[in-house]
Regions:
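Conserved N-terminal catalytic/coupling substructures associated with nucleotide/phosphate chemistry
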Residues: 1-213
Length: 213
């Protein structure tokens, strides 16, 4: 970046010129940054819309809600479990993936308004807190928090939840009623694995983990 030593300019006219040029540079830099940010926001929204409109695949899954049941109009713990199951499936896969909440299976943007009514603070902060608590309850491994990045982009006027899940360095199990369940993202669905099947899969998927233990 260009820097100017003010001590080199002692005359008033040079100081005025310097200040004017500095202000002009600042104004133009500010305009450039705003334009870049606006372009980035437009790019991000366009890219996310492409993800939303694409069919579900090995790296993309959509969920209408986190805990709001559209049929009963009330909270449904099994919906919360399905979120943890999807996260577990991506974490256990080779590539990880993206989970979108507030978008139905057909790609229609629903938003999070109904979920917000059921969580603390009734906003994205409360939503993320309850989501992370729920995930920890079902997956019981704090490493999951390191694997997920949660954001709340606005698309077509609706706020949704985007969860980017990195592949886990070790096997992740889901716990319910004292039992372990195993899921892996395969194709466009999250598949259950019997324990013996998951053991065989884990030997390939987590070979490095087992070689160190």
């Amino acid at each position: 970046m260009l820097s100017i030593d003010n001590e080199q300019f002692s005359k008033t006219d040079f100081e005025i010129t310097h200040n004017s040029l500095g202000q002009l540079f600042t104004d133009r830099l500010g305009n450039a940054e705003r334009t870049a940010n606006e372009n980035q926001e437009q790019f991000d929204e366009t890219s996310l819309l492409d993800v939303i409109r694409n069919r579900e695949n090995v790296r993309i899954e959509r969920k209408s809600s986190f805990c709001f049941d559209t049929k009963t109009r009330a909270r449904n713990n099994q919906l919360e479990k399905s979120i943890s199951k999807a996260i577990q499936g991506f974490a256990n896969s080779f590539n990880g993936g993206i989970l979108l909440i507030g978008v139905d299976p057909d790609g229609k943007i629903i938003g999070l308004k109904n979920d917000y009514k059921l969580v603390q603070k009734h906003n994205s902060d409360g939503f993320e807190l309850e989501l992370r608590n729920s995930v920890e309850k079902y997956l019981r491994d704090k490493i999951v928090h390191e694997l997920i990045v949660i954001s709340f982009p606005s698309i077509e006027g609706e706020e949704i939840c985007k969860i980017k899940i990195s592949p886990s360095p070790k096997p992740i199990a889901l716990y319910e009623n004292g039992k372990q369940e195993f899921y892996v993202r395969v194709g466009n669905s999250t598949r259950p694995y019997a324990p013996v099947e998951f053991i065989e899969y884990a030997k390939r998927r987590f070979a490095n983990f087992y070689s160190l233990n």
